[in-house]
Amino acid sequence: MTLETSDLTGDVQGVKPSLNVTVFGISAVVILAVSLASIFAPNTVQSLFDATVTWTSKWFGWFYILLITAAIVFVIVLALTRFGNIKLGPNNSTPDFSTFSWAAMLFAAGIGTSIMFYAIAEPVGQYIAPPTGEGETIEAARQAVTWTLFHYGISGWALYGLVGIALGYFAYRKHDRLTVRSTLRPLLGDKIDGIFGDIIDMFALVGGVFGIAASLGIGVVQLNVGLTIIFGIPQGLVAQIGLVSLSVIMATVSAVSGVDKGVRMLSSINVFLAMFLALWVLITGNTTFLLDALVANVGDFVTQFPVLTLETFPYQRPDEWMNAWTLFFWAWWITWAAFVGMFLARISRGRTIRQFVIGTLTLPFTYVLVWVSIFGNSAIDLIRSGNVEFTKIAYATPEGGLYALLDALPLGKILIAIALFVGVLFYVTSSDSGALVMANLSMRNLPDRQDGVAWLRVFWATLTGALTITMLLAGGISILQQATIVMALPFSFVLILIAAALWKALRSEASKATARTRAITSGLISMSGTAAGRVRLSWQDRLSRTFDAVSPTRAKRALDNRVVPALEAVGTRLQEEGLVSEILIEGSEAHDPDDDRRFLGRASLVVSATPEVMEQLIARLLDVPISGATIDAESFRYVVRMIVMPVPTFGATLSDEDDTTVRLEVRPHGGGQGYDIMNWTADQVAHDVLDHFERWVEYLGATSTVE
């Protein structure tokens, strides 16, 4: 056995979720103000963002690039070290989704309207106007796709992974709320439940709205071109407002009528349609060239990635190029980090950090690699073959590049119709998913498996749509890109704090694991009766104890007559030393949701103390002077659970469902293998409690001196 520690998680059980007026109100006012300014003073808004982006690029361009690089290194280090074995959930938890389903969801997460746009727009742009060197050369062609893979590749997913790990770790392993603020508890403590936490969530919310608006703006412009080609609907404000209205309607229907499952099913179909488009382009296009280029792109990306990820162009800085590409993409990833990170955390509960990192860095990028290589190289091949009309469309009006490429292939009009359908569905599902996360960030005390109220989802979908339209009016896609670069800056500092808090929590858990190992060793000795105060059982008695069934009545009697008195005796003695102790007797309603075994109840000893008392206790027991040190004084818990188990059988005999026994099991708080104290005396239980209490004190002493 080992100790249990409360993680100061701010348990919200029994507390009704409510609107966070501060986060909701201030965020809504900021976004509404920008929207109104874009309508009534578009030139002023354009000039303001021009100046702000120039300043941000000059003074913080290096910071964005270094931040993304640091995120990549950070998550890889987590995966390769002992931290990689830690689960996003208790040690005994299992993944909510099968490996195949989880991989499929990660794969699909790399798909969206924006990649349909940039898979052609960026390679064409980089080929004709590269950041350095001459355009429309063989070298420019190779670099064009490499730059696109770099901007759309593992860099951003490392950022998503960082936030996803932190959210999953604190929500599912530390039992905190699934919010951005909860990831900073190791640094800010209970301050995150006040104004500091509100500020953090506001940064995430406002930045996310602008990131989503940029995605929706790109989608609106591209889909408008598709509607013109298929249905003859003119490009302009009316069609764009119609598309935005469609996203709001879909979000409303999804929130009010509960058709989320239907939308998700269509999204799954959409993934296969997108893959069909890529396969069709590969087969009906210049197949051998595309396959050769795919292999070459992989090699170029792998060899050049270390250089590209730290490239700031200090000696010949292409400011306009940096703002339009690298800085925009890095800011875009940052604004989306909280939203995608929350999705990744939700689907990865029960996975280890190592599995999570490997999955998020490889599976979405696999799709990006294939899609960008096929479509990007196809576009470059058309340009190099002398297709002047395609070149003009793809470079001058990049939103029409995808349709122009498909139109050059067999069954072009049918392919365009499929691409339009795929784009529309990706567009509305992105809006709906974004509104859902915005609603969650606007709530207080929201359980991790519950979503925000319907009207909030509709509100945020509407406001985001309004922001998208007004900013398109003020300056088109370019102003949305500029706004993203600016709005990402506040949340970028939050990301640094998230990484620091996660690292601190993981190091603390590692120290705790060392103490736990000693405690388990002591517990195993106790089971054989060799520890102080215990009588060694004969091997015959120990074997009989293993196979004899224990009824619930007998187990309850042992709990009441031996375990609880032992806990009370130890608690009383600790109170005499100035500590606060409490005995909790709970029934089956206290069942651990992460344990699928039948649970009958539990008895717990909870011990806490002021930092001053703990300082004196550590100094006395460990002979370690720690005056003035910071003590991570979590509550000590010794919990005995009544668990129903099948009676062990061997050979050809199988147990019937009624062949069960009850264990009085002491199990670590983080999960793992517990042990049975059914036949222990009260004295043995008391000694076991003290064994782990001493380990707990040792752990506090170690962490207080290390910090």
Enumerate the language-model features and the residues they cover:
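N-terminal alpha-helical transmembrane segments of multi-pass membrane transport
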Residues: 2-140, 256, 506, 593
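Helix-loop-helix connectors at the membrane interface of multi-pass transporters/channels
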Residues: 4-18, 177-195, 219-242, 272-277, ...
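Flexible loop linkers connecting adjacent transmembrane helices
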Residues: 5-14, 47-53, 80-99, 124-147, ...
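Membrane-water interface regions at transmembrane-helix termini and the short interhelical loops
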Residues: 10-16, 41-56, 75-96, 144-151, ...
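Transmembrane-helix boundary/entry motifs in multi-pass membrane transporters
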Residues: 13-22, 57-61, 91-109, 145-154, ...
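Helix-loop-helix module between adjacent transmembrane segments
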Residues: 14-25, 29-39, 72-77, 111-116, ...
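Loop-to-transmembrane helix boundary motifs in multi-pass membrane proteins
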Residues: 16-31, 189-198, 233-252, 256, ...
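Extracellular/periplasmic helix-exit of transmembrane alpha-helices
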Residues: 118-130, 281-304, 365-396
